[in-house]
Regions:
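Helix-turn-helix DNA-binding helix
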Residues: 63-67
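Short, Lys/Arg-enriched anionic-surface-contact patches
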Residues: 16-38
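Helix-turn-helix DNA-binding elements, focusing on the entry/boundary residues of the two helices
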Residues: 11, 52-53
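Short alpha-helical "recognition helix" segments of helix-turn-helix
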Residues: 54-59
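DNA major-groove recognition helix of helix-turn-helix
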Residues: 46, 71, 78
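Short Lys/Arg-enriched helix C-cap and helix-to-coil transition segments
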Residues: 11, 77-104
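Short, amphipathic alpha-helical "recognition" segments used to contact nucleic acids or chromatin
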Residues: 34-51
């Protein structure tokens, strides 16, 4: 249950910054803004939650190789574009950071 709250916390952080909801990130939509938001969430799950590629793939409804590709893209974006380095500034999830009802609006 705590992992689920942590997942929704990071999804909410990405939604606040990009305007792309969780359902859209989990969809098959390949538009640039959706793909970048998806990759941001994948990055946070890997580096903040310490999930494996398979665990991330299951949560994001993707194949693990797609998750791996997303992490590679995020690495390149962080090196070339300053706005992507701000992902590291997102605070680590703590149980008192968020209440369960706060996550209800993020799914478009």
């Amino acid at each position: 249950m705590n992992r689920q709250r942590e997942f929704y916390y990071y999804a909410e952080q990405v939604t606040k910054r990009t305007g792309v909801g969780l359902r859209k990130m989990q969809s098959q939509d390949r538009h640039r803004e959706v793909a970048e938001a998806r990759y941001c969430l994948i990055y946070l799950m890997r580096h903040k939650m310490k999930l494996t590629l398979m665990e991330i793939a299951k949560l994001m409804r993707r194949h693990y190789s797609t998750v791996h590709h997303g992490l590679e893209v995020m690495h390149i974006l962080q090196v070339t574009m300053k706005k992507y380095t701000r992902l590291k500034e997102i605070k680590r999830y703590e149980h008192h950071n968020i209440r369960p009802r706060d996550t209800m609006y993020i799914c478009n």
